[in-house]
A protein has these predicted regions:
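Positively charged n-region of N-terminal signal peptides that target proteins for export
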Residues: 1-9
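C-terminal motif of bacterial Sec signal peptides marking the signal peptidase cleavage site
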Residues: 16-19
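Bacterial signal peptide processing site
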Residues: 21-23
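N-terminal helix-cap/turn-to-beta initiation motif at the start of protein domains
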Residues: 25-34
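Post-signal-peptide N-terminal segment of Sec-exported extracytoplasmic proteins
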Residues: 39-75
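Short, structured surface segments that line ligand/substrate-binding pockets
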Residues: 69-109
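Short, well-ordered, aromatic-rich surface patches in folded extracellular/luminal domains
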Residues: 92-136
Length: 136
């Protein structure tokens, strides 16, 4: 009986540790390191480039401060089974790599930000609409 109780306690302990993991934050470059943001709508191909530093800083801040981890994983280069999405590409000067992308989309009346192979976050609908409104 003690053996089963020990196994049960070990199982509960491991479960508690994995269930209480820290929430992931979306990873974006610092606004000062970004030279350009390009927002492209898929599948239409409509695009806009943003080079003004104040606007770049606002977009980065809005995305960072208005996302909440869903715990979902991203296993692909772009969202799967999503017909319409925005690709927000961040171009910057860095010796290791020079661009990064975040996909924004709506699914079942909720809005999401997805980084390839990194994760999926909920993003406030107002921020999604503001960024998508830059295409008009």
């Amino acid at each position: 009986m003690k053996k089963y109780m020990g196994i049960a306690l070990a199982f509960i302990f491991v479960f508690a540790l994995t269930a209480c993991g820290a929430k992931k934050e979306i990873s974006l470059p610092e606004a000062k390191d970004i030279t350009e943001i390009e927002i492209t709508e898929n599948p239409s191909g409509n695009a806009v480039k943003i080079t003004e530093q104040d606007e770049i800083a606002k977009i980065v801040k809005d995305i960072k401060e208005n996302t909440k981890d869903t715990g979902g994983e991203s296993y692909h280069e772009q969202p799967v089974n999503i017909k319409k999405f925005l690709a927000v590409s961040f171009y910057y000067n860095n010796t290791e790599r020079n661009w990064e992308v975040v996909y924004l989309y709506e699914n079942r009346n909720k809005t999401y930000a997805e980084q390839p192979y990194s994760g999926i976050w909920k993003i406030k609908k107002e921020v999604f609409k503001e960024i998508s409104g830059k295409l008009k």
